[in-house]
Amino acid sequence: MNFAFTEEQEELRKTVRAFLDAKSSETAVREQMETANGFDPAVWSQMGEQMGLQGLVVPEEFGGSGFSFVELGVVLEEMGRALLCAPYFSTVVLAAQTLINSGDAAAKKKYLPGIAAGETIATLATTEPSGKWDEAGITMQAKGSGSSFTLSGTKMFVLDGHTASLIIVAARTGKGVSLFAVDGNAKGLTRTALSTMDQTRKQAKLEFADVSAELIGTEGKGWDVLSTVFDLAAVALAAEQVGGAQKVLEMAVEYAKVRVQFGRPI
């Protein structure tokens, strides 16, 4: 079995690295860390319009390129290497994968094209003040029937939650954990940016007070979808870390070549 990347995948890596070298320098990263939004909208638009990165794994029928998670892993490695400040993980890994795995054809048709084009910033809101990451930790209540519901409760540590135009929320109905789409500017939704240790990745507290929401997928089957998405997210985060570690190794090797100690090169 061959675990090496293909020529096409390495070419993708080369292209993405060149783009990020130009757009995500150390200076640019530090500048974006200090902004409220945490990213450069112009760069985000270029990622979608020129590079097609937001639509990389979105199926072609919804405006994407239809590549696999392997290609996404290559891109994420390079983003980790460059410490890119952008809502890519929240939009492409969390939200888009939730939609893709929801089995909801109407929701995919409605939301994925905007994500693929780089026009929609999206995120996934699951964690609550308890800090629990399992199914029992989801206690937010959803009231309603059919496809129309209202949500009340609080979500914490939502990646890019203060800037997302689409928020996919996990909440409970009488049938169990379900998934809902909420407009980022919906009435009754209060969004508060949080202070984070990793300033390249913004988070927010979201408070819902009878906020209108649209059911995604099958009512009561939300945790099945989330279990898959969380596994994919773990792989995606590991890819970012691999890229970051590779960059650190390269820097250490280069420094070792010029470092002199006690009158001799180390």
Language-model regions, residue ranges each:
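A structural signal for short hydrophobic beta-strand segments in well-ordered beta-sheet cores
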Residues: 140-143
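Short secondary-structure junction/hinge motifs that connect adjacent elements
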Residues: 27-49
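A short, Trp-centered hydrophobic/proline-enriched beta-strand micro-motif
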Residues: 118-129
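Internal helix-loop-helix
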Residues: 48-109, 113-118, 159-166
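A short core secondary-structure module
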Residues: 125, 152-190
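Residue-level signal for inorganic ion chemistry
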Residues: 9, 20, 75, 104, ...
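Structural signature of FAD isoalloxazine-binding scaffolds in flavoprotein oxidoreductases
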Residues: 66-75, 134-138, 182-183
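Glycine-rich beta->alpha junctions and the first turn(s) of the following alpha-helix
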Residues: 2-8, 12, 81, 189-266
